[in-house]
Design a protein with these regions (language model features):
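Short N-terminal segments immediately surrounding and downstream of signal-peptide cleavage
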Residues: 24-43
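Sec/Tat signal peptide C-region and signal peptidase I cleavage site
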Residues: 18-24
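Bacterial N-terminal signal peptides
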Residues: 9-17
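Short, functionally important structural connectors and interaction interfaces within domains
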Residues: 8-10, 45, 57
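Acidic, Ser/Thr/Pro-rich low-complexity intrinsically disordered segments
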Residues: 25-27, 48-133, 140-142
Length: 142
């Protein structure tokens, strides 16, 4: 009886491990697609902002942009550009930028005049995806 339980637990653990590995590989693939937009002149902030989204969901990521710094925000979902809409808002909810007004551009460069905490909202482009991994990368110039 103990051997059956052990085998059942072992099989379940292996199955979960493969599932987790597959999801991690998908997410890493999307991050690699997104990373091509952080060219050599931009240094990554070291974070990979990622989540799984359904078409009716909005993800929120929080970060601080420091005054006097030029940033690049790259946003991807899937293996092609334009699948993720991102909006950057200040603490009052004022929209500082949205790529929706720029044909869902996969990245955008901007200079921050004064330090500000921001929320980056990400939603899938409903015309191209019903669900998917969303990845946002942030780089800055030194």
């Amino acid at each position: 009886m103990n051997i059956k339980r052990f085998c059942t637990v072992l099989i379940a653990a292996v199955a979960l491990s493969f599932s987790y590995t597959a999801k991690a590989q998908i997410s890493d693939t999307v991050a690699s697609v997104c990373a091509k937009h952080l060219t050599q002149e931009y240094i990554s902030d070291g974070q990979v902002y990622r989540t799984l989204l359904q078409v009716d969901q909005t993800a929120e990521f929080h970060t601080t942009f420091y005054g006097g710094t030029t940033y690049r925000v790259a946003a991807c979902s899937g293996l092609s550009d334009g699948n993720l809409i991102f909006t950057i808002k200040d603490p009052d909810g004022t929209v500082l930028f949205t790529n929706k007004e720029h044909k869902n551009a996969p990245y955008w460069d901007f200079k921050i005049n004064s330090t500000v905490d921001v929320t980056i909202e990400a939603v899938l482009n409903s015309e191209s995806a019903a669900s998917g991994r969303a990845v946002i990368l942030i780089g800055f110039k030194q």
